[in-house]
A protein has these predicted regions:
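Bacterial carbohydrate/catabolite-sensing allosteric modules
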Residues: 2-182
Length: 182
C-alpha cells in the first residue's frame, strides 16, 4: 500500500509479504540472509525493509545484511551486487531480492561463479514475473496478483463513479510460490 495515497489504495501488504518470504527462509534453516534492494519508490522500500526487519528480529538474527543499490532493479544490478554481498558477508547462505529480475541476475552470477543454488546459496525474488519460471533453477518468489489488483481498482472506480463511495483501502492477498531456488 502507498503510505500516503491521494485517494483509493488497492494492493498487497508489502510488509506482510516480505515478512512471509523471509520467515520461510528462516524456517528452512537459513541463518545468514541478505536483502538486495534497488531503486524503487521510497515507501515500497520502507515496507519491504520493515517486513524484513520484523522477521529477522523475531528470530534474533542480524538484519544488517542489506544493500540498497542506487541502480535499476534489473538483471545487471542483481548480477553486479551479488559479489558485493559475498565480499561484505562471505557467510551469506540466502539472498532475498525485491524483484525477480534482481534475483535472476543474482542466479546468473551464481552460475558464472559456480555457486550451487540452493545448496551453497538460496535466492528468492518478489513478483512472480514470467522470468521467475524460466531462470535456472526456477525461482521461489512472492506472487503479486497484478490482474486481481487491476480488477479491484476498476471495480472501485466504477463504484465510486456510480455510488459516490468506496473504502479508501483494500488489501489483496499475495502468496508464496515455491520453486527450486531455495
Amino acid at each position: 500500500f502507498a503510505s500516503d495515497p491521494i485517494d483509493m489504495n488497492i494492493g498487497i501488504d508489502n510488509v506482510a509479504a516480505m515478512y512471509e518470504l523471509t520467515e520461510m527462509l528462516i524456517q528452512r534453516g537459513y541463518q545468514n540472509i541478505g536483502l538486495l534492494c534497488a531503486n524503487q519508490e521510497q515507501w515500497i522500500f520502507q515496507q519491504h525493509l520493515h517486513g524484513w526487519y520484523k522477521a529477522m528480529l523475531r528470530h534474533h538474527m542480524s538484519p544488517n545484511r542489506v544493500i540498497n543499490a542506487a541502480l535499476p532493479p534489473n538483471f545487471s544490478t542483481g548480477a553486479s551486487q551479488l559479489p558485493e554481498f559475498l565480499l561484505a558477508w562471505p557467510e551469506l547462505d540466502a539472498l532475498v531480492c525485491v524483484s525477480d529480475e534482481l534475483a535472476c541476475g543474482a542466479l546468473y552470477e551464481c552460475q558464472r561463479r559456480r555457486i550451487k543454488v540452493p545448496d551453497d546459496l538460496a535466492v528468492v525474488g518478489f513478483g512472480d514475473s514470467d522470468v521467475s519460471r524460466v531462470c535456472q533453477p526456477p525461482l521461489t518468489t512472492m506472487t503479486v496478483p497484478h490482474r486481481k489488483i487491476g480488477s479491484e481498482a476498476g471495480r472501485a472506480l466504477l463504484e465510486r463513479l456510480n455510488q459516490g463511495n468506496w473504502s479508501d483501502r483494500k488489501s489483496i492477498a499475495s502468496s508464496l510460490c515455491m520453486r527450486e531456488s531455495c
